[in-house]
């Protein structure tokens, strides 16, 4: 720790501890920031001794400055720390990191202007971003810039082999040789399972290439051989051979484009592995906006490796079929084959807060609105409500509970004592008659035979079918079922009277209050 913190002298260390990390902040720089900066320099292949002088810090800033706009947070923090150390070596008084950055950038710009025009870094000409450039009539290989490699690694880490990785690889690997493509693949640290899938695809495609392009035979001395599958993959060929195959005058072989196509096949398999959702399973939720559903649908469609005609059919059929019922009702009203713009415009407000508010208002209105009563039913209810009859005195206008007349004793139906109206024996019999002891009736009807009445018609003779005139008609035979019913009813009446006799008098006294008030009621 002592050796690493010795990049600054004691006086400069005191000055470092006075510099604030942020303008107006409380935290200040200390020795642990110097130690962290030394460890970060090792990752960029820079020696820690460069921090001991102003010129060394200038070299570090020259390397880091182009990477700051697209760099990570650690890179930006390292650049800020080196700017502060640079200002301390240059004996510039700074209060915080922002002042140190401004002074360091001003010095870098001044040093760039002092450089001669021939050695000053300039932007490459049109097409200069390609790894292979033509200089003085010769094709020269230029290594990939760290910015390109950083963009590729960030794409893989952020998208996690989503559908965007394939077009991103196509854009970043344009014009690359197999050597450059292998360099891009080697930069991917994580996702080694996906890298292994890509290697297997490369081996399969290389074997197919060797079968389709056999070796023609011995070649004359000095003639360039034709590329094999391993040569296209960059394992058995050099960069110079790859450039010659790509740009020779006779029978050029675009080994870079062929290798890119193999990598794209492997990336497409990785996309399907990392995104197992089938497009048939993409359905709109009941409250999901239509635009969000369309975004998910086309993202899944982009990952599908099918024919364009099949994708067109999926767009025209599944997009409307898998929408929720509200959007589907609107989309079917647009006619045949509506455009995507028309569908988005028509379903713009469905599923949003506006539609929810309208549905809530309609439901609340229906709940608060009373159900209409028909006019005839209302009149009938009003007529019934006006004709209230008292069971005690028989008058109209009040109920038995409100009646002031003396309470009528006995049955309210027949007026007899000893029973109540619900147990009145003179109540009307049903279709199957009255059952014994107040239970349900039996499965035979009860026939009432009047006593003392002589039939007007003579009985029929079963043999002749008619009774002779002048003969006295005999009484009809007694029905055993009627006799059994009568006996059951008599037995039931006796049992009810025996059960009600102990508390009959107490019940009548409680009903009429004769024991308390006597005749004054």
From Swiss-Prot:
Keyword Cytoplasm: no
Motif residue range(s): Nuclear localization signal: 26-32
Residue span of region PPIA/CYPA-binding loop: 214-221
Ranges spanned by the short sequence motif Nuclear export signal, renumbered to the chain: 16-22
Sequence segments annotated as region (Interaction with host CALM1): 8-43
Interaction with host AP3D1: annotated segments: 12-19
Basic and acidic residues: compositionally biased ranges: 105-114
Site location (Cleavage): 130-131, 360-361, 377-378, 430-431, 444-445
Residues covered by region (Interaction with membrane phosphatidylinositol 4,5-bisphosphate): 73-77
Gene Ontology molecular function: any one: zinc ion binding
Keywords: AIDS, Capsid protein, Host cell membrane, Host cytoplasm, Host endosome, Host membrane, Host nucleus, Host-virus interaction, Lipoprotein, Membrane, Metal-binding, Myristate, Phosphoprotein, Repeat, RNA-binding, Viral budding, Viral budding via the host ESCRT complexes, Viral nucleoprotein, Viral release from host cell, Virion, Zinc, Zinc-finger
Any one GO CC term of the record: viral nucleocapsid
Post-translational modification: Gag-Pol polyprotein: Specific enzymatic cleavages by the viral protease yield mature proteins. Capsid protein p24 is phosphorylated possibly by host MAPK1; this phosphorylation is necessary for Pin1-mediated virion uncoating.
Motif position, PTAP/PSAP motif: 455-458
Ranges where the record places region Interaction with host PPIA/CYPA and NUP153: 186-223
SUPFAM superfamilies listed in its UniProt record: Retroviral matrix proteins (SSF47836), Retrovirus capsid dimerization domain-like (SSF47353), Retrovirus capsid protein, N-terminal core domain (SSF47943), Retrovirus zinc finger-like domains (SSF57756)
Superkingdom field: Viruses
Family the UniProt entry places it in: Belongs to the primate lentivirus group gag polyprotein family.
Protein name (record): Gag polyprotein
Region called Interaction with membrane phosphatidylinositol 4,5-bisphosphate and RNA, residue ranges: 14-33
Listed transmembrane segments: none
GO terms, biological process: viral budding via host ESCRT complex; viral translational frameshifting
